[in-house]
A protein has these predicted regions:
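NAD(P)H dinucleotide-binding glycine-rich loop of Rossmann-like/cofactor-binding domains
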Residues: 83-94, 124-210, 232
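Adenosine-nucleotide cofactor-binding segment
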Residues: 174, 209-212, 224-291
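Glycine-rich adenosine-cofactor-binding loop
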Residues: 191, 207-224
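C-terminal hydrophobic helical "lid"/dimerization subdomain
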Residues: 17-18, 290-294, 298, 335-384
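Glycine-rich beta-strand-centered segment in the early N-terminal region that forms part
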Residues: 46-63, 77-128, 170
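Glycine-rich Rossmann-fold phosphate-binding loop(s) that bind the pyrophosphate
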Residues: 62, 187, 211-214, 307
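A short N-terminal beta-strand-loop micro-motif at the entrance of redox/enzyme domains
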Residues: 11-61, 87, 106
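Glycine-rich phosphate-binding loop and adjacent beta-alpha segment
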Residues: 250, 286-347, 384
C-alpha cells in the first residue's frame, strides 16, 4: 500500500535528557526538543496485520492538520516545530474516514463495508487517568499518526473501540462529501471538548476565537450552533476570515493589523465593554494568551487548544481580579464528543465541509504540506 511517511534524526538538544528507554523506542514527549531535520515522502509499505481487537479501514479521506505542518516545518536549528508526542518513522494522518475492510476476531460491533471515522487518541484503559474517565490524559497515551501509523495511507489499522459509524453523514451529504465531512469530526471534536467540557461554555455566552485554522473554524461553527450570544474571530488570513463568515461569525479581525492593544480594544468593543466569556486559543502563536486575558469577562475562561513551541507570559493579577482562568485542553476522547459532533453535522446544524479549500491525491500531499506553511488556505484534504 502507498503511505506518506515522516522520518527525522534523533538528536536531543543540549541540556535535554529524554526519559529512560526513549531513544530505543524513538519516542519523544516533545518533538521540538529531540527530532531534527524531518523529511516526508510517499512510499510503499506492506499491508498492516489486524489484531483481534482492531479493524482494517480503507481510507476515503484524511485531512492535513496544522500538527502535520508542524511535523514538516523546521526551526532555525532544523528541529521540527511540533512540540508534542511523536515517534519516527511514522505514517502521518489522524483526521480520517473510510470503509471497514476487515475486522479482528474479537469484533462484533463492526463488519466489512461499514463507513466509519475514528478517534486519534489511543488510551490504555488501565492507568489512573483512564480509570477516572480522563482518557486524553492517559499516562501511556499513544496517538494515531504520531506514535503509530496513521491514515495518510490507503489502509490504516486502529482499535475498534476508537471507531464511530458515519452512515448518517453519508446519507446527508452523499458518499464523496460525506466522507470528507466525517474526516473533520476529529478536529471539530477537539474544539468541542475544549469549549463545552473544559471551558463549560453555555448558550448566550460570547466567544472570541484566536486562529482560523480548522480547529479555530470549528470553534466558530460550534459556538454558532450552540447559541453563542456573539462569535468573533481573530485571524491574519483574509481567506480564512471569509471561511469563518460562512460558518456564521459575527465579526472578523486581522490581529497583525491591530497589534495586541488593538485586539484588546476590538474585543472590548465587540463585547459591549465587558470582555468575552470564552476565548478559544487555537493558533499556538506567541503572545496571544496574555492578550486574551486582558479582554476577559469576569469569571471568563481562555481555553488553550493550540500547540506551539513558545512559552507564555501572563499576568496572574489580571486573572485573580476578574476571577477568570486558563483551561488547557488536549484531545477529543470521552464525554460523547465524537457522537455529538456527528449528530450536529447529520442534523444540518454544522457543515464543516465548507472549510475544505483543496483536495489532493496522496502523491500531492507532501506539496500540500509546503503550501500550508503560509497558513492562508483552509483545510487540505487527501482523498482516495
Amino acid at each position: 500500500m502507498q503511505a506518506m511517511l515522516v522520518e527525522a534524526e534523533w538528536a536531543p538538544r543540549g541540556g535535554v535528557a529524554p526519559e529512560p528507554g526513549a531513544a530505543e523506542r524513538r519516542l519523544a514527549r516533545n518533538g521540538n526538543l529531540v527530532w531534527r531535520r524531518p523529511r516526508f515522502r510517499v512510499t510503499d509499505l506492506p499491508e498492516p496485520p489486524v489484531a483481534p481487537d482492531e479493524v482494517l479501514i480503507r481510507v476515503r479521506a484524511c485531512g492535513i492538520c496544522g500538527s502535520d505542518v508542524h511535523l514538516y516545518e523546521r526551526d532555525a536549528e532544523e528541529y521540527m516545530l511540533y512540540p508534542g508526542l511523536v515517534t519516527t518513522p511514522v505514517v502521518t494522518g489522524h483526521e480520517f474516514s473510510g470503509v471497514v475492510e476487515r475486522v479482528g476476531s474479537a469484533i462484533v460491533d463492526f463488519q466489512p463495508g461499514d463507513a466509519v471515522c475514528a478517534e486519534e487518541i489511543a488510551w490504555c484503559g488501565a492507568c489512573l487517568a483512564c480509570k477516572s474517565g480522563q482518557f486524553n490524559y492517559c499516562s501511556r497515551l499513544e496517538e494515531l499518526g504520531f506514535t503509530f501509523n496513521g491514515a495518510h495511507a490507503e489502509l490504516v489499522v486502529t482499535r475498534a473501540r476508537s471507531c464511530w459509524p458515519i452512515h448518517s453523514l453519508v446519507r446527508r451529504f452523499g458518499a464523496e462529501r460525506g466522507f470528507v465531512a466525517a474526516a473533520l469530526v476529529e478536529p471539530t471534536s477537539v474544539a468541542y471538548l475544549g469549549m463545552f467540557v473544559q471551558a463549560s461554555f453555555r448558550p448566550g455566552q460570547t466567544v472570541a476565537v484566536i486562529g482560523g485554522g480548522p480547529i479555530g473554524l470549528a470553534a466558530v461553527g460550534l459556538g454558532r450552533a450552540a447559541g453563542a450570544g456573539r462569535v468573533v474571530l481573530f485571524e491574519p488570513s483574509a481567506a480564512r476570515r471569509q471561511l469563518a463568515e460562512a460558518l456564521g461569525t459575527d465579526a472578523t479581525f486581522d490581529p497583525r493589523a491591530l497589534g495586541p492593544d488593538g485586539v484588546v480594544r476590538a474585543a472590548r468593543e465587540e463585547s459591549e465593554g465587558r470582555g468575552f466569556d470564552l476565548w478559544v486559543e487555537a493558533s499556538g502563536a506567541q503572545g496571544v494568551i496574555d492578550t486574551a486575558t486582558r479582554a476577559l469577562a469576569p469569571t471568563g475562561t481562555v481555553a488553550l487548544i493550540g500547540l506551539g513551541p513558545h512559552r507564555a507570559d501572563i499576568d496572574p493579577v489580571t486573572l485573580i481580579r476578574t476571577g477568570s482562568g486558563l483551561r488547557g485542553s488536549l484531545g477529543h476522547s470521552g464525554h460523547g464528543a465524537f457522537g455529538n459532533v456527528i449528530r450536529l453535522m447529520a442534523a444540518g446544524r454544522l457543515d464543516m465541509s465548507r472549510i475544505v479549500t483543496r483536495t489532493v491525491g496522496l502523491n500531492q500531499a507532501v506539496g500540500c504540506l509546503e503550501d500550508l506553511r503560509d497558513r492562508e488556505a483552509g483545510k487540505c484534504m487527501v482523498v482516495f
